[in-house]
Amino acid sequence: KIKANVIPDEKAMQKVSEVLDDPSAPLSVKVWTDKKEYREGDKIKMYIKGNKPFYVRVVYKDAAGKLLQLLPNPYRRDNDFNGGVVYAIPSGNDKFELEVNPPFGEESIAVYTSTSQLGDLDLKEEGGVYQVKTKSKDIGIKTRSVKIKEVTEGKAQQASEFFEGKAVVKTGK
């Protein structure tokens, strides 16, 4: 057996952090939760942070496979965020909480992000969020689909950047 003490290299960790926050780097968005495991009745809080301004769609998949779009939602339609800022979900005008109830098991939070507006999904309003009617396998494709918008004169066209991230949590009694 080998025993070793691991001492984190602060300079290396700082360098990695700077790269992840660099707005000139390709779009990168981190998603995480306040805990990895939740019990019945717990409230899930999630966070997102991008390295540059971005648009986001946040989709929650419960243990039964039901998909809910948390952002944008009926009360918080704006889905554009600044880079370098940590955002909590739910917060602000959100009219929902993520309370752990059966069925229990592995659940996930997926973020679909872009530097330009996102394509549309087939949604049905359900309380303070939307139920996603689009098939799970098609969400990424439809999110990245083209949105027609007017071009303002003199403004150079930029290619859109996309990023998908995911956080997985376990729920139980």
Question: Across the structure, where does each feature detected by a protein language model lie?
Answer:
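Secretory-pathway glycoprotein ectodomains that are cysteine- and/or Ser/Thr/Pro-rich
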Residues: K1-K173
